[in-house]
């Protein structure tokens, strides 16, 4: 037998109704945040424009699209930061409310604040890398806002782990569209009028480009973004680029496929400097703090070098 969700979906498809076109149950709506967003682009948002966009219907009644853009929007985004790679320990959690535009700005800032920057060194030059490419975060967030099924009350869920960032929204793919279609750039928009508003505000460039931008942001990375789809859920998983860089170094080290022998280079450094610190190894070899520390510890265990001092004063000398 069909589930309640499946029956509801079939009825919607048969009747041809769209959530954003239906009358909003709340007609006492204000649009402070949305008007600010329009003002940023020097676009007028008065009653004629509201009718054109579908915020007000032909009878002068606010639609559900109006509800989504209003300060009274009932749909929310829930975020959580977890310790490690599972959901056992919460580090932080927060729920964002208000207009979709208010949520968009606040959630992006929330993620951006926690999107750490790690530095590596290539010869004399420092290279800064954020955990998650900003364009990928932006497009994943916009995808959730524009494409989710607002006919359901479930919140968008954004979960940050040690090694990944997940965006989960209610509403699978539109009927007739496959995941393969999406990966090839095909997009059938569930909320056409909402997408049109975002398009007019230059938040999205064209329908169907978002997923490709996410993939392009990781084109030089070891692990790629992952998209999971069920009948009712769409999930985008962004790998932590700095976490995977350390994983890549681990794999290279243990399989001995490095272009140069780190231990030999470190011994040469000690011959020249007499004593060295971990940071010097990190900068000279262009590896992470974790990897440089591990190599030095292994060299101590092998009896190649000795460790002297503690904390910031720790240094390594030839045995």
Residue ranges and their predicted role:
Residues 300-308:
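A short, conserved structural fragment
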Residues 231-268:
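Conserved alpha/beta core segments of nucleic-acid transaction machinery
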Residues 260, 277, 310-319:
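Short, cationic-aromatic polyanion-contact patches
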Residues 272-284:
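Short acidic, hydrophobic short linear motifs in intrinsically disordered regions
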Residues 1-154, 160-162, 168-188, 210, ...:
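Active-site helix-to-loop segments that bind/position phosphate- or nucleotide-bearing substrates
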Residues 296-297:
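Short, hydrophobic-biased segments on the C-terminal half of alpha helices
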Residues 290:
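Key DNA-contact positions within bacterial/archaeal DNA-binding proteins
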Residues 165-200, 244-259:
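Glycine-rich/acidic phosphate-handling loop/turn and adjacent ATP-lid/helix
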């Amino acid at each position: 037998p069909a589930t309640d969700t499946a029956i509801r979906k079939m009825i919607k498809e048969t009747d041809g109704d769209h959530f954003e076109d239906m009358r909003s149950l709340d007609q006492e709506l204000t649009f402070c945040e949305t008007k600010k967003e329009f003002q940023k682009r020097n676009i007028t948002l008065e009653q004629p424009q509201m009718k054109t966009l579908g915020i007000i219907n032909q009878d002068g009644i606010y639609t559900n699209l109006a509800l989504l853009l209003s300060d009274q929007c009932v749909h929310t985004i829930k975020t959580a930061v977890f310790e490690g790679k599972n959901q056992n320990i919460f580090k932080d959690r927060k729920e964002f409310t208000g207009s979709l535009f208010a949520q968009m700005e606040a959630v992006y800032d929330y993620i951006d604040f926690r999107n750490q920057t790690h530095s590596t060194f290539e010869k004399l030059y420092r290279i800064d890398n954020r955990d998650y490419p900003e364009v990928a975060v932006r497009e994943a967030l916009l995808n959730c806002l524009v494409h989710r099924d607002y006919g359901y009350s479930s919140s968008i869920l954004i979960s940050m782990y040690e090694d990944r960032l997940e965006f989960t929204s209610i509403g699978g793919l539109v009927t007739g569209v496959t995941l393969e279609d999406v990966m090839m750039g095909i997009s059938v928009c569930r909320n056409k009028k909402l997408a049109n508003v975002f398009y007019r505000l230059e938040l999205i460039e064209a329908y169907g480009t978002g997923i490709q931008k996410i993939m392009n942001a990781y084109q030089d990375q070891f692990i790629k973004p992952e998209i999971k789809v069920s009948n009712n859920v769409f999930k985008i998983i962004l790998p932590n680029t700095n976490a995977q860089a350390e994983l890549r170094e681990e794999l290279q080290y243990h399989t001995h496929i490095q272009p140069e022998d780190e231990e030999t280079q470190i011994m040469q450094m000690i011959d020249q400097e007499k004593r060295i610190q971990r940071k010097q190894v990190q900068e000279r070899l262009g590896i992470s703090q974790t990897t440089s520390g591990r190599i030095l510890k292994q060299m101590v265990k092998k009896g190649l070098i000795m460790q002297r001092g503690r904390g910031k004063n720790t240094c390594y000398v030839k045995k």
